[in-house]
């Protein structure tokens, strides 16, 4: 089995993370987890209080245990809160262990007047590696806002990354961005939004994946597999996910297909170990 750390991570996530010690013995970097504290006096925007699985404190001591049990040596946090101060909250939360928590993909609203100010301030910390597009203010007219393109250009100029969540965005959106900003490093979240049903992958989805993957700066995370399953509880057998994973492997290859779990959301479908076993099973013969 090839190590679940690929060359793109060195350039995308580790550049600027001066505290990270390169070590050939590190087998796995999880590029997609969330940390939050539901007991904070100010509360938090996500997860909702009625989520019986996720609404509880999810802090470093909880992921430390999971990562130690499963051989995860380093991780990148993806900020799930839309509150700007929560970016710094996470950076402060993990500053005691910079070798394990090596980066943060932040949450800032693209196309807003203060985007550059907030990005500049947060980027003074080398662990702040980029942002994620999650919500889509303005709906279909979002990309008609030139301020959006100015902010995306700023990310590209800074050599920072753009994570794209497929719930309100599409692979066609990714393709459009790459055509206008070919040097922007993009990481598509959650197996490119695949609808996984345990049967041959949707031909339209395959074509969209292949189109988006033509740009060498577009990468894809094998994250959220359990969440993309139409069958619940999520199957734990690799064969159920094989078709979509094969498509992604053919499109992105070993250099641009990146491991991420989406923990603790993975717990809706199974344990971390069960999730990792599916991914390791896929890479076993690669």
Predicted regions and their residues:
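Mid-to-C-terminal alpha-helical segments outside catalytic/metal-binding sites
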Residues: 2-4, 19-21, 26-31, 56-74, ...
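C-terminal motif of bacterial Sec signal peptides marking the signal peptidase cleavage site
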Residues: 15-16
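An N-terminally biased module of ancient metal coordination in phosphate/nucleic-acid-related enzymes
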Residues: 20-89, 94
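Short amphipathic alpha-helices and their capping/turn segments at secondary-structure boundaries
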Residues: 21-28, 116-124, 172-181, 203-214, ...
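Short, well-ordered coil/turn segments that N-cap beta-strands
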Residues: 24-27, 71-76, 98-103, 125-129, ...
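H/E-rich (His + Asp/Glu) clusters that bind or coordinate divalent metals
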Residues: 195-286
């Amino acid at each position: 089995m090839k190590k679940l750390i690929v060359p793109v991570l060195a350039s995308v996530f580790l550049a600027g993370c001066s505290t990270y010690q390169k070590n050939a013995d590190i087998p796995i970097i999880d590029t997609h987890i969330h940390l939050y504290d539901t007991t904070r006096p100010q509360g938090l925007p996500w997860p909702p209080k009625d989520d019986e699985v996720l609404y509880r404190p999810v802090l470093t001591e909880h992921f430390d245990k999971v990562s130690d049990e499963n051989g995860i040596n380093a991780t990148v946090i993806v900020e799930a809160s839309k509150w700007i101060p929560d970016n710094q909250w996470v950076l402060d939360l993990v500053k005691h262990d910079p070798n394990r928590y090596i980066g943060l993909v932040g949450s800032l609203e693209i196309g807003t007047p203060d985007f550059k100010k907030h990005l500049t301030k947060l980027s003074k910390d080398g662990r702040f590696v980029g942002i994620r597009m999650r919500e889509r203010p303005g709906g279909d007219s979002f990309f008609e806002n030139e301020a959006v393109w100015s902010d995306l250009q700023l990310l590209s100029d800074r050599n920072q990354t753009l994570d794209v969540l497929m719930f309100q965005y599409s692979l066609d959106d990714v393709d459009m961005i790459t055509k206008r900003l070919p040097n922007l490093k993009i990481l598509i979240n959650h197996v490119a939004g695949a609808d996984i049903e345990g049967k041959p992958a949707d031909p339209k989805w395959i074509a969209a994946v292949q189109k988006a993957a033509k740009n060498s700066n577009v990468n894809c995370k094998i994250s959220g597999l359990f969440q993309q399953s139409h069958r619940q509880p999520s199957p734990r057998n690799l064969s159920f996910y094989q078709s979509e994973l094969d498509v992604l492997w053919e499109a992105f290859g070993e250099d641009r297909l990146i491991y991420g779990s989406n923990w603790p959301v993975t717990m809706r479908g199974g344990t971390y170990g069960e999730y990792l076993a599916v991914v390791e099973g896929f890479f076993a013969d690669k």
